[in-house]
């Protein structure tokens, strides 16, 4: 019981470096303590502040001070407008860029809902891109023997809705066999379904952009 832990900072960064070398893709990882930021910035392109830590000033400033892009997840208890302070701190510290990610709002105990107005409100309040986390938004916090449960069947519909509502990007956790993933197994999208879903939402995004009045993607 309980949530799985990662391999540790050194081993984790080695694995990320291997992924970057093999794929040539930009890398993103969470950081949980200020002391981790400079080390992680040697390997990854984007430092991500977890939602529960988005008000930790020392962490946000340390991430920004690396000069990397900083993605800050909105706390599940926070209004979109409240993210402006965290964005300002990351910018002032020297971040190359900042984004804010919507990942749902507490709706009672052990449940999250997504307010699709959040993307426009985040942009208006912060002036930075608003990202949608389509997988953590279906979490059921603390519902699986001390770890998070989830409702992954809702991932595709929420992703489609977020693109229609004008989000600027997507964060999606995926795995070839989610049931075998050491963490977040109950709120991942199977890898085989990722490509078709992205094809679908890119078409949707084009439709939204063609009729956009300047709000959103």
PLM features: residue spans?
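Glycine-rich, proline-tolerant flexible connector loops at the mouths of alpha/beta enzymes
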Residues: 1-10, 174-188
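Active-site glycine-rich loop that binds ribose-phosphate moieties when present
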Residues: 11, 53-58, 82-85, 114-115
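C-terminal helical cap(s) of enzyme catalytic domains, especially alpha/beta-barrels
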Residues: 177-210
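Active-site mouth loops of central-metabolism enzymes
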Residues: 1-7, 26-30, 50-51, 108-109, ...
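N-terminal active-site wall of soluble small-molecule enzyme domains
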Residues: 1-48, 56-59
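Catalytic beta/alpha-barrel core
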Residues: 24-33, 45-58, 69-80, 98-104
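Catalytic alpha/beta core domains of metabolic enzymes, predominantly
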Residues: 66-174
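Surface-exposed amphipathic alpha-helices with a cationic face
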Residues: 14-21, 64, 87-91, 120-124, ...
């Amino acid at each position: 019981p309980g949530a799985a832990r990662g391999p540790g900072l050194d081993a984790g960064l080695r694995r990320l470096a291997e992924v970057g070398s093999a794929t040539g893709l930009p890398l993103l990882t969470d950081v949980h303590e200020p002391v981790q930021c400079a080390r992680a910035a040697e390997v990854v392109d984007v430092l991500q502040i977890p939602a529960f830590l988005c008000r930790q000033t020392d962490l946000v400033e340390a991430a920004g001070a690396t000069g990397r892009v900083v993605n800050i997840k909105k706390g599940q208890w926070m209004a979109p407008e409240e993210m402006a302070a965290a964005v300002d701190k990351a910018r002032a510290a020297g971040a190359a860029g900042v984004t804010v990610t919507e990942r749902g709002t507490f709706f009672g105990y052990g449940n999250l809902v997504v307010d699709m107005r959040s993307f426009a409100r985040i942009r208006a309040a912060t002036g930075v891109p608003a990202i949608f986390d389509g997988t953590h938004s279906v979490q059921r916090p603390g519902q699986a023997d001390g770890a998070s449960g989830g409702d992954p069947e809702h991932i595709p519909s929420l992703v489609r809705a977020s693109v229609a509502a004008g989000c600027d990007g997507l964060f999606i956790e995926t795995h070839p066999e989610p049931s075998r993933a050491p963490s977040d197994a109950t709120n991942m999208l199977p890898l085989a379904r990722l490509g078709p879903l992205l094809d679908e939402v890119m078409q949707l995004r084009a439709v939204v952009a063609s009729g956009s009045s300047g709000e959103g993607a």
